[in-house]
Every structure is written in structure tokens, then in C-alpha cells.
Amino acid sequence: MASLLQDQLTTDQDLLLMQEGMPMRKVRSKSWKKLRYFRLQNDGMTVWHARQARGSAKPSFSISDVDTIRNGHDSELLRSLAEELPLEQGFTVVFHGRRSNLDLVANSVEEAQMWMRGLQLLVDLVTSMDHQERLDQWLSDWFQRGDKNQDGKMSFQEVQRLLHLMNVEMDQEYAFSLFQAADTSQSGTLEGEEFVQFYKALTKRAEVQELFESFSADGQKLTLLEFLDFLREEQKERDCTSELALELIDHYEPSDSGKLRHVLSMDGFLSYLCSKDGDIFNPACLPIYQDMTQPLNHYFICSSHNTYLVGDQLCGQSSVEGYIRALKRGCRCVEVDVWDGPSGEPVVYHGHTLTSRILFKDVVATVAQYAFQTSDYPVILSLETHCSWEQQQTMARHLTEILGEQLLSTTLDGVLPTQLPSPEELRRRILVKGKKLTLEEDLEYEEEEAEPELEESELALESQFETEPEPQEQNLQSKDKKKKSKPILCPALSSLVIYLKSVSFRSFTHSKEHYHFYEISSFSETKAERLIKEAGNEFVQHNTWQLSRVYPSGLRTDSSNYNPQELWNAGCQMVAMNMQTAGLEMDICDGHFRQNGGCGYVLKPDFLRDIQSSFHPERPISPFKAQTLLIQVISGQQLPKVDKTKEGSIVDPLVKVQIFGVRLDTARQETNYVENNGFNPYWGETLCFRVLVPELAMLRFVVMDYDWKSRNDFIGQYTLPWTCMQQGYRHIHLLSKVGISLRPASIFVYICIQEDLEGDES
């Protein structure tokens, strides 16, 4: 594929013109619009920009970081500048993770189309690369960076500089011996294939070679039977057949003669270990593998809080981009805070704050466009409506007209249900969650439990009022005043709420006696955590028949997150996260929903679906079978530099392993650090964990740069469910702080899970 990329770079007209470069206007806001010169580098993998045509250039973005290309009409920012900048000449580069979009405006429609076609072609090529092709391209990229004078050759001085860039601290004499061995032309420089040989010598994996030789009779190859023994004994793939082992050899053995003889060379063995089949995440858990025919309340549902915000809760920007990003990452419940807007059009923003405002109809149109691009399973619009009767009618009209048949406006088949429908039954449908009028209610309604700005303070006041009740007269006046200020619920909007009627939570007993399966309560994180401690088993039982939504405390004005695991432990289905904020909590959320096709629905364990369940997340007892996990952290590969501006700095990496689950299972351990080696550090240390409830456990592997003077710096992480972990020798491919792949950066581990014998407490 790397060669296909090189072919395209020399033949495709769009790519040839992009390599010449051209001026475009870079747009950050209505007031920031600067002319920059953009050029595709010769490697076809990076785009650089400069302030002037012949000025000093710097990297703008890597093709591997690009998710998609959108035309100007789809850009919220460019649309707001349509009178000043022609939309037809604009386009947007959308990146993976949480990186901001790049809005560009070319000098002509033709130039804009050329860049859009060219960039999309490159993105498609990179997306279809396998591990070896990505490695080849990665090497090509390093060669370009190391070849400072761009003459297509690398001197030893350039190689020394490159080693520092690659995080390698190496004895100069040893480095020179590798350089001379690779310089087969004896020219004093390394070219193309010579550099590849130098890299292979540099990255020789002694620990993998030793493993290979321990199963190979002659130390040169693995026969079909030897490879089958390895898969069954070490990789714990007990059901592996000769046919499956042969498929793996055919896929990963690079030589045709090896394939014909059904043997695996050292290169093929390493290729297998670095592939998805050798990954710690079980490939069987990547597609949709769970039963999707159970009621909605039997699933954890990927949920977003204040989806419209791309910044903080007080002054941040509101944007439809928040909905696009949430939906494209598999989020199935998005929040819409709706208020009266000018000209009779409802607006979405964080009420009573300085956050910017967007039109409700634009949000609905965005949901209609992106709802099912990543997952076919239902999307829930969680409406927080603060509008007048008239603007509620406008909301209902927009929902009906824009969503069309996607909107679920009646029960399935018109039949009165006895339980919530399943994700399978609701494929490609959009459900409205909100207040609903019933025959018993009048048109004035009590708002759902609010998401207050000062949750903890209000809780303190609540507890005070419990012991010091208001005088009855004052209380009645307060209620009358409150009643007058409440908006009136519009029947047209109410009628669109079918299965997800919002109700205030009073107690578990009250819910059991007065509420129905199609009603849903929202809890602040503080209240939910308190209920788990005080009545954990009741909360679990409540969540077996009714949906619960949990949202972050109003004190989190910086859009920080809580740990969703604590709420999942009680079976809470919709744990809403501030998805715009990267960090440990979002790593756990992303890792949890990476399974099951990334569809946004994960089936809860059976003990969280049984209405008679005795499970208490704070005090888990039998019949759970505890498991012991042994992790040998063996080595690391091509770990990135933390501070790329310091050319001479090299990381001192250590690996931290964290377990999140029920409180008794939460633990962390770490290795020692390896000094001055981010390229191929070796640890060889074993960590041991005992877990009581593996069905709820999440593992997070974090690589840190040790710093004796201050806090260790983050290098990369990977988080996954315990139940999706493969045993044996596995590679863990690291992700950045914002969730972007850091390939080829990885750590190599050995995983062994032992089930405790019944009654064994040792």
C-alpha cells in the first residue's frame, strides 16, 4: 500500500498540484482569517503551511490524524461568514479525537475541489493500510524528517540526529557499527532499502526472538504444528484448529515459499504478534456480538451531557459540532437544552450562562444527518425544555418535519407494550426523552429534576430543610409562586414522547408503587453516588426495570468528568459524560464502549438484569467467581517523546496498570522506570491483581515519563473491559491523551487469568 501511495503521488493530478502548494485562507473565527500557504509533503503523509510562499514552513497536520473532509456548506463557521467568503470555495478538515476542525477557503472552487478530492484519496489510502504498510509509511516519514538536506540520503550525522528524534539513546560506536552494516553500497550514506535494514537492526526484538525459538525446533521457522502448540498453550486459544492456524500463517507470513510450506518465519511471527489477532483486545468483541433483542433498560447506553458545548459550562462555545462528534463516536443519547429564541425560533445553550447559542432546528438537522453514520441502533434526544407554549410548538414541528420517518412518534406496531422495546426493534429510530402529559395531569407540569449549578450546596440546603420544615403558609405561597413561573407543556411536543417519559425521583419505593417501565428519572452524580452507598441493591433492582440517567455535578463548570464505572456498577444505563473533555474518565468510557461494534449499547451482566438480584456494588458477595490476573510487562516499542520541542530529551518510561470496577476491585500498580529509552525499553516485571467481579472490571494501561522533580508526564494509554481481554503474549497499541492512535507505539505484555477455586480465599 505504501508503494500504491507513492504511485498516486507521482501520477494523480490533484496530489501533484497539492505538492506544489498554494495559498488558502485559514479561518478560526469571524475575526481571525489569515492567508497561509499550504503544501502536501513529498511523503504524502503530512501537510505543511507557511506565512509566505517561500517562508519557513511547519507541520499543519498528518493525514493519519484526519477523519474526513467536509465541504464549506457543512461548516458552521464558514456558513456564518457566507456573505464574506464563498461557501463553494471552502472546506473543512475534520480530525480524529478532540482536535479542533481546520476551516480553509481556497482562491477558487476548482482549487477547493482539488484539495478535497486529494485529501480524501489520501485518507482512504491510509485507512486501508495494514500493520506492515503503516510501518513502511512510518519509516518513510522518519527518513524524510532525518534527511535534513533532502538529498534522498542519510549521513551518519543525520542518523545520530534522527536517533534522538526517535527517542533512542545509543552508544555512538554501536550506532556506527549498525550504520556501516546497513551501508551495503559503502557510500557513507544510507538510501531507501539500506535505511530499512538499519531500522530492522535497530529494532531487533530479542524477547520475541527468544519466544520464537522456544517453540521452533530449528530456531528458523515455526511449523504448522509448532505454531498451533503456541496458540493453544501460550495464547490460551484452546479451540484453535489447524485450519485457523493455517489461515494465520497465510495472512502474516511475508514469503511465498513459507506460505507454500505452511511455516511461519520470525518476521511472520512478529507480524502476527503486532496485528489485531495478537492484540490484547479480543477481535471477537469488536463486531456486534451481544444479544440486541433485550429491553433498552438491559443495556449500558453511551450518553453525552450538554452535547452542544465544545468548551466549559459558563462561557464555552455552543456548536452543532458537539453533536457531530458525539454521534460519530457512537454516542446514542445526546442532550438538548432548549430556550426561547428571537424571531420565534428556539435556541440551544446552557441557560443563565454566557455560552453562545445555536438554533434548535440546526441541532435537529445535524442529528438527522449524523445519527446513524456510526451505529444503526436508536438515538435518544434528551430534551430539557424551558420554552413557551408557542416555541414548544415550533420544536414539535421541527422534530416532525426534519426527522421524518426517523422519529418514533407512536408505539411499535401501535401495540400497547409491557416492556421497553429492544435496540434491534428500534434500529435507525430517534426517540424523544422528555416530559409527557397524561390524563391525570393538567397542562402545568413540574420540571424534571434540574441540573443545578451548585448541586452540593443545594443538597446541603435540602438536608437542612428536612429537619427544619418551612411554615405551612410560607410553603404554600412558595408553591403558588413556583407554579405560576412554570411553563405550560405543549401537547404537540408531549405527544412525541413515547417510551421515555421523564419523571422526578422520590424514592425507590415510590417508583415501584407509582411509576411505569416507560418512565425515566435523572440523578445528579452526587445523589446517585449517595444512593449507591445507602441503598445499592435497591438501585440495582430499580435499574432492572426502569431507565436511569446520571449527569455531572453543576459544580463541574470546567466540563470535567466523574468516573462512570461507579454508576455502571449499580446498573445505571445512561451515564452522561462531558465528551469534549479528555482524561481518565473518558478513557474508561471510550474503552467500555469500544466493544460490541462501538454501537453505543453494551449488554449489562446478568446480575444487573435480574429483578430479584441481590447484588450490592459496595458489598459484592458470591456467586461471583473471583479471578487473579498476572501481567508481565515485557517491553515497549517506539514510544513518542513527551516534549517534541526538546530535541535531546529522551523519556524514562514506566507502565502503570489500573483496575476500575466495584470499589473492592479498584487497584493500581506500576513498574520501575527505564532510563533514557523510549524506543525499545525493557521491563520484564510481573504485576498481580485479584478481582472479585470481573464482569464489571476495566483495565487501563498507562505509559508515563518518570520525572523525579515533578509529576510524571503522560505518554499514552489504552483502556479495555476485562471481558474483552485476550490472554497470552499480546501487544497493547497506545492512544494519545485525546484518543488518537500513536502507532507504532505499543507495549508488549504476557497476560494470564486464573479463576479462583471455589472457597479458595488465598
Swiss-Prot record:
Region of interest (Disordered), residue spans: 443-483
Main localisation: membrane
A GO MF label: calcium ion binding
TM stretches of this protein: none
Record carries keyword Membrane: yes
EC number: 3.1.4.11
Cofactor(s) the protein requires to work: Ca(2+)
Annotated residues for binding of Ca(2+) 3: 306, 335, 337, 384
Region of interest (Substrate binding), ranges: 26-53
Binding site for substrate: 433, 435, 522, 549
Family annotation (PROSITE patterns): C2, EF_HAND_1, EF_HAND_2, PH_DOMAIN, PIPLC_X_DOMAIN, PIPLC_Y_DOMAIN
Record localization: Membrane; Nucleus; Cytoplasm; Endoplasmic reticulum
Domain PI-PLC X-box: 290-435
Entry GO terms, CC: endoplasmic reticulum; nucleus; plasma membrane
Placement of sequence motif PDZ-binding: 731-734
Residues of the PH domain: 16-124
S-S pairs: none
Chain sites annotated for binding Ca(2+) 1: 147, 149, 151, 153, 158
Location of the active site: 305, 350
InterPro entries the UniProt entry points to: C2_dom, C2_domain_sf, EF-hand-dom_pair, EF_Hand_1_Ca_BS, EF_hand_dom, PH-like_dom_sf, PH_domain, PI-PLC_fam
Keywords: Calcium, Cytoplasm, Endoplasmic reticulum, Hydrolase, Lipid degradation, Lipid metabolism, Membrane, Metal-binding, Nucleus, Phosphoprotein, Repeat, Transducer
Chain positions recorded as Ca(2+) 2 binding sites: 183, 185, 187, 189, 194
Binding annotation for Ca(2+) 5: 705-707
Residue numbers binding Ca(2+) 4: 650, 652, 676
Subunit structure: Interacts with GRIP1. Interacts (via GBA motif) with guanine nucleotide-binding protein G(i) alpha subunit GNAI3 (inactive GDP-bound form); low-affinity interaction.
This protein's name: 1-phosphatidylinositol 4,5-bisphosphate phosphodiesterase delta-4
Gene this protein is translated from: PLCD4
